[in-house]
């Protein structure tokens, strides 16, 4: 794993949790329901959503399957403008946020 990849992973721990929470609420699923579907404890899911822990690849797959979304959606929702290099931010502003709204049906 390169330094950039490690930095991206560390930087996005909380964002992935927020993305899971946003998508879960959009689907009108409680933490308890999603945790049961993913075969993890409610405390574990809460810890992920609050950024206290980072989900494993297996857990990410289970969460995405349970929410009926591709993993790429979760990655898109976990990216914030702060994660984008300065020279690419214009693209994120023009496409990233509007795309998230379309996917959320807002």
Where in the sequence are the language-model features?
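A short, Lys/Arg-rich alpha-helix, primarily the initiator
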Residues: 2-26
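Short, charged recognition helix plus adjacent turn
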Residues: 4, 76-106
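Conserved hydrophobic/aromatic packing and binding residues within compact polymer-binding modules
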Residues: 20, 34-35, 45-48, 74
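DNA major-groove recognition helix of helix-turn-helix
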Residues: 49, 59, 78
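DNA major-groove recognition helix of helix-turn-helix/homeodomain DNA-binding modules
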Residues: 56-73
């Amino acid at each position: 794993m390169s330094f950039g990849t490690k930095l991206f992973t560390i930087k996005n721990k909380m964002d992935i949790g927020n993305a899971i929470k946003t998508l879960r609420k959009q689907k009108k699923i409680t933490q308890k329901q999603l945790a049961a579907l993913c075969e993890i404890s409610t405390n574990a899911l809460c810890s992920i959503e609050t950024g206290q822990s980072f989900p494993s690849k297996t857990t990410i797959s289970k969460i995405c399957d349970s929410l009926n979304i591709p993993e790429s959606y979760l990655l898109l929702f976990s990216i914030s403008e702060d994660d984008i290099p300065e020279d690419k931010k214009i693209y994120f502003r023009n496409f990233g946020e509007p795309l998230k709204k379309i996917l959320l049906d807002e």
